[in-house]
Amino acid sequence: MEYITMRNGTKVPMLGLGCYKSEEQEGVEAVKSAIEIGYRHIDTANFYENEKYVGRGIRESGIDREKLFVVSKIWPTSFKTPEVAIEYSMRALNIDYIDMYLLHWPSQNEYARNHAFETLLKYKEKGYFKEVGVSNFKKEHLEKLKETFGFYPMMNQIEISPWLQKKEDYAFCQENDIVMTACVPFAKGNILNDPKLVEIAEKHGKNVGQVILRWNIQRGNCVIPK
């Protein structure tokens, strides 16, 4: 497993399991199987409505909690009362702490966004989270967050693939030491038949999925295929 070090010194496994639409027992088994074959980065969210299954999979795997990097997220509709969503995540996952808790989207309501982020920081101080970050934030959202709080978040999770490279966002995060996590790296499966990527994969004796994962990791991105 390869790791990237955030600016606070925390090492993050670069390859993770995305748990979107992993439901009930299927979700439990997916998490257990992923951990068994070496995954150490598990990503879920309030919006996915599967935190309790993800948490059960983690517990049933028997792995030491300290060996995992667990991520969850709060949906914008909860930004005005973030405490409710945070407490729900903790109860549903039923683990001692969450490694990274993210704002899932920036929301058009800047006041609510700032309130939610401030609340996440308070819960970090209480020991609920090791760190807090964001998801789907563009450069302007990140800059506004820094104007308000004096620092950039540790992580920004956004959709990235060879078809959707987000070059401006990528460059900005690289310049400001914000770890990027690439979600939907396979473009919902459509990219797996891309002729150029098929050619590259065949040349190296790999499949297209492996090529895309390596492309992200070599660029310094964490990547969370489903």
Regions found by a protein language model. Give the residues of each.
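Short, acidic/polar
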Residues: 22-35, 78-94, 112-115, 140-143, ...
